Amino acid sequence: MGNYVFLNICLYTEGTTDIRFLENIVQQTYERAAIQAYGEIDIELHVITINKTGLNFTQQVLKAAQKAKQEYGATIICVHSDADSSSIDNTLNTKFVPAQRCLLEQENDSCSKILVNLIPVHMTEAWILADKRLLKQQIGTTLSDTELNLNKDPESISNPKQAIENAIRIARQNIVKRRRRNLGIGELYAPLGQLINIDQLMDLKSYRQFWDNVINSLKQLNLMRAN
């Protein structure tokens, strides 16, 4: 029988709505990755919140990583930031590379040192569109992707949040008035995060990059073969 490892992992996101959608996805991703690891790994995810007033991105990450280490003893911290474009390269180079450098410069055990970047293309809502069937179930519509103007690659939609809000509006127009209710996108983040299929997310390049980062973080802890 292999070794048993209990692993605290922390998550820091740009906003509270991002937490509602991403928390379960990060948990599921690590649990799936852990299947490939040596022995048995029990994952517990903790959401980190800080007062970020006046702090730049690197300072926010450092403060979150210090809290992650002090409160949970976490070596790994996942940090979310939207790409705000069709490529994650700029966000990676201008935000995450300096932040990782800063963490590595800190004294040992003063903060989480393994930074796992989570960078959706354009914005988090692009990941919601990875499973359009689930989205339509939650909206309560049988309209087609084309009728809802969602018949595109999620990562090619420059404003996925607006696209989802537009789809909700179109769907509501096709519901009998007495059965309508004012559904807002804010109500969808938590249930979609709980129900979305990781296999669907694998169709997105930005999620696959997050998956690779997760695998690499476990390798850095010598929990997986480094090959």
List where the protein language model places each region.
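C-terminal accessory helical subdomains adjacent to catalytic cores in phosphodiester-
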Residues: 2-8, 19-48, 59-227
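Short hydrophobic beta-strand that contains or immediately precedes a catalytic carboxylate
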Residues: 11-13
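Short polar catalytic/cofactor-binding loops
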Residues: 15-17
